[in-house]
Amino acid sequence: MAPTQLDIKVKALKRLTKEEGYYQQELKDQEAHVAKLKEDKSVDPYDLKKQEEVLDDTKRLLPTLYEKIREFKEDLEQFLKTYQGTEDVSDARSAITSAQELLDSK
């Protein structure tokens, strides 16, 4: 059976909130890696510069991700206001709550 619009919207929002956790972990790992490279005096400056660029890229990506989470959350909320289907919407409400908690913490 094909996924419904509700399933698609819920899974998309959950995927984005999960990705945020991965990006936060990547950010921590990259910060630790850059700090370690800065302590090591034998590191090639080019390698350090490239790792700092990777760190900056991750930092720049997060605000865009938060905006996407906000958009998907609002889209799901609007969808639920007019939803007339018979599916259980508790999973959708849970995803909205999780997304809102994530956004509030940032």
UniProtKB/Swiss-Prot annotation:
GO terms for molecular function: beta-tubulin binding; tubulin binding. Keywords: Chaperone, Cytoplasm, Cytoskeleton, Microtubule, Phosphoprotein. One of its GO terms (biological process) is tubulin complex assembly. Disulfide bonds: none annotated. Gene3D superfamilies: 1.20.58.90. The modification Phosphoserine is found at residue 94. Its main location: cytoplasm. SUPFAM superfamilies: Tubulin chaperone cofactor A. Present with 1760 molecules/cell in log phase SD medium. Tubulin-folding protein; involved in the early step of the tubulin folding pathway. This is Tubulin-specific chaperone A. The gene is RBL2.
